[in-house]
């Protein structure tokens, strides 16, 4: 089964909570027929299912802690295999959060062709998340939790970006720009993969 995904185009999408990476991923799916896999969405779906694993995950997430690496990786791999026949490529959103995760991903699944680093200022991300929290009802969208998530994000992500920069596959995208301008830059990066 895993052979099916061996030659697929894999794009890591990294960006803080509220950076706009979800929006950009939607646009990529629409234009390129990629499968968008968000580790956060996969985790939330597992929690919503009420399974035993879901209950354990919920307890971890409510504390604002990171979910164990193997759990996330298994969920991503299962989801990739499930979509292998219909997918033109994969957007792996919100992963890897640390270098070790990236290394494990490559061992078990494959190497990324590109890392899109969707970057916005910290205050922009806080504002966007506060606004989203008013409408989403997501329990992790309150200011204290948001700041904690951003701190965790920066600490974890900087080494990841540096690690992939040494391979020359990182494209830093300024997501302070209007959505369509951001997407134009994203398109350029993906088109270079062909």
Swiss-Prot record:
InterPro entries named among the record's database cross-references = Adenylat/UMP-CMP_kin, Adenylat_kinase_CS, AK1, AK1/5, P-loop_NTPase
Query: In the record, what terms sit under GO molecular function?
Result: adenylate kinase activity; ATP binding; deoxyadenylate kinase activity; nucleoside diphosphate kinase activity
Which of UniProt's keywords are assigned here? Acetylation, ATP-binding, Cytoplasm, Kinase, Nucleotide-binding, Transferase
User: GO cellular component annotations, sorted alphabetically?
Assistant: cytoplasm
Xref: CDD domains: ADK
Q: Which Enzyme Commission number(s) are listed?
A: 2.7.4.3, 2.7.4.4, 2.7.4.6
A GO biological process of this protein is: nucleoside triphosphate biosynthetic process
Give all N-acetylalanine modified positions. Answer: 2
Q: Where does ATP bind?
A: 18-23, 132, 177
Main site of residence?
cytoplasm
In the record's own words, the domains note is:
Consists of three domains, a large central CORE domain and two small peripheral domains, NMPbind and LID, which undergo movements during catalysis. The LID domain closes over the site of phosphoryl transfer upon ATP binding. Assembling and dissambling the active center during each catalytic cycle provides an effective means to prevent ATP hydrolysis.
What family does the Swiss-Prot or TrEMBL record give for this protein? Belongs to the adenylate kinase family. AK1 subfamily.
What does this protein's UniProt record list under function?
Catalyzes the reversible transfer of the terminal phosphate group between ATP and AMP. Also displays broad nucleoside diphosphate kinase activity. Plays an important role in cellular energy homeostasis and in adenine nucleotide metabolism. Also catalyzes at a very low rate the synthesis of thiamine triphosphate (ThTP) from thiamine diphosphate (ThDP) and ADP.
Q: Which PANTHER family match?
A: NUCLEOTIDE KINASE
Q: What is this protein called?
A: Adenylate kinase isoenzyme 1
User: What taxonomic lineage is listed for the species of origin?
Assistant: Eukaryota, Metazoa, Chordata, Craniata, Vertebrata
